[in-house]
Amino acid sequence: MFSLDGYKAIELSPRIVPRIMRVDGSIEEGDVDPCGRPWVMWEGRFPPDNSLFTIYASTGMPFDARRDWAVGEEGPAPDDSPLGLEQERMTSHNGSHVQGGKGHISHWKGVPDDMKGLWELDLETFLGEAAVCNLSNLEPQAVTTESNYPKEYPKAKFWLPKAEPGEIRGQEILPEHLSNVQKGDIVLMASPFAGLEQPWLSTRTVEWLIEDRKIKMLGLGYPGIEWQYDLKVAAPDNSPVKRMLLGANIPIVHPLVNIETIASDRVFYYGMPLHVAKLEASFVRAVAFEEQGRSS
């Protein structure tokens, strides 16, 4: 029989407190996920037995106004939410979530025709042996040449050009920094750095993870690892990390927390997506099981 005796369960999903509007009209304030996305809910009542349920709000308008507008009203959507949530939204990319290729980037130029959706991947993709890569030793350094940093880097709402020599930036993550990654692993990456000082995942390292290590999923702490860059570059060179991994049917799970608290360099990971067809991403409750007494 399978047993977790001798293992410690470590929470990898950030705890999120939703903002919720109760049926009595009261509002309970919430917070946002690590990426700054709000979790917004409306409470409803099930008439047959007077039980309560919650609706994940997709816009700032009240439910009735949303429904009425959706069935044929012309013009912009109503903007009269008592919650003041006009710019807030809920998608399957809120909180810790796993994303696949089909339905997410399948419209991009140059992606493989055989790219799969989450619902088409084997269950074993989302659980199993995982390499823990805490990259706290990759301290930011002064850039020596223009070519050793991504062409574009997001910071707040601005797009910065390539880093110039002498500027402080995160280091490139290389295969030599991931020596504990074994073939067929799930890989969990984190670092204590943020912003421009985060170590960044280069395309040559992603290629090594795909072709040599044949990893089955990549999990990323946030902040800590920069992997979403070159977003505005013309296809087929845009978003290279996402493009390469999802194109190889290797899902990405993020934003994760507590990776840096794991003492061992190997754990058992579990984090299942919802069993829903055509869902390009799914909420997950990600957990790492660390063997007690084991360390790196």
Task: Enumerate the predicted regions with their spans.
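Active-/binding-site microenvironments in catalytic and ligand-binding cores
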Residues: M1-S296
